[in-house]
Amino acid sequence: MAIAGQIAELQAVSPGATEITEGGQVYIHLPTLALPDGCSPNRVEALLCLTQHGGYPTRLFLSHPVGRGSNPSSHCILGRTWHTWSWNYIPANLRPIEILAEHLRGLQ
């Protein structure tokens, strides 16, 4: 569970960021997230998972596949299809903004 100050950091990069829970799993919903150069589309909706999901300590899910990252996969979360890639070992003990930055590195 993220604290208010950590959510505020994420709101600086994605205004309207909020915490959402589904089935005991906590996500940070990022309504608009700018992606690194070369991704298409270059802005997407995202879910940042700050706890283990599918064998990864943290995950970043995107509303659209972006043509970057290795071993892409899709997952049904909150009744929608979300896309991610294999980018592991980003620890949950980082601040959420740091977790987000590390996941975005996987798309560069």
Say what each PLM segment does.
Residues L30-I77:
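Compact alpha/beta protein-protein interaction domains typified by the UBC
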